[in-house]
């Protein structure tokens, strides 16, 4: 998962096309992604995966609502911030064509639902909450970003897609005050008992907001399968990159915050306040227990991580998945509830040469032995368009083996991380200038490290267009990644 303003360009890489003819006879065009000449990715893979997803940004900005807060129309109030992709109807149409689920890059993270911009929640009004562990604590009187939940759900509904909720529990992009006395970023860390109570309140509050929105918008009940948010990343990136491969006794050399590279560090530098408070995996088990208590039983609960194919990190993810599934029942909200894990989500930020397909597939098969898998944030770094196209083809040929026709647990969702390069985390600072003529090809014709044959530069134009514009003259080297994915089916 990438942080604010770090959106991948993978989908644009998939949609970058050339003017030559592919082997299956489909015409390769440079048309807009809505054109009939551009095939739908979700339709192409409809017989292989339940869901094809896109990661999108709605934007963090001032909102005003016309009408009821659940069903009304949300617009930019012009007071602060800037709308992004999902806010615009043009992008909603493209998303609807190519995907049946989306993941929001930032909008549902604790940072943006709590909206304590300086890390402090001490000045916000409070109310009393009695948690299932018996702790009675003060909690914020509301989620300051509640309107952002409803605005993004409304935009997804308008786009005709479902959503993977991202994310409930994370070491990063969670306000410092959430972990500290009086919600002050300068306070002492709270006890694990208080933190458990806060954790339950937060998950309960977010999921109840979603449930209220779904009820108001005609989604037919808690256990019916008819949900806009059909899956949640309950915990994100809790394993350390330098995790050890053996765990004995009290040795915790696997969790983020316990290893030499993460211990004692701030979250921005790889540490974890969660681990500082708990010193073990208890908070992870709690998260899946709380999510099971407050989410519909048919909403999928996921553990999500990156570098999941590394030889030392794969066993750490296996370990936590098995611990979640073996977790004991506790009384939550008056009912006996066990932790529930349905999915291991492989972020899949990969390169064209590392990991190898074999290394990735070996990790995938280990995870499938435990649960279903989501490929949750797929993008591929590459040095050229041809290199990227080859990598995409190889990955999709491998992934589809584990789709609907695979016996046992399956890959049920593949999400492509990003739809344009405007704020790419892979190559955010490279600008290319093709000359004086600009032609708008929204979201289609760029790739990770895409290089023109002539070494010319491409740059964004200023003005009112919210999407980049490009001059695609006859020397512009568009790539074949989109057709590689289509043709690998």
Regions found by a protein language model. Give the residues of each.
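Glycoside hydrolase catalytic-domain groove-lining segments
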Residues: 132, 140-159, 276-304, 310-412, ...
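Short, acidic/polar
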Residues: 64-96, 201-209, 313-332, 360, ...
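Bacterial Sec-dependent N-terminal signal peptides
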Residues: 1-4, 8-43
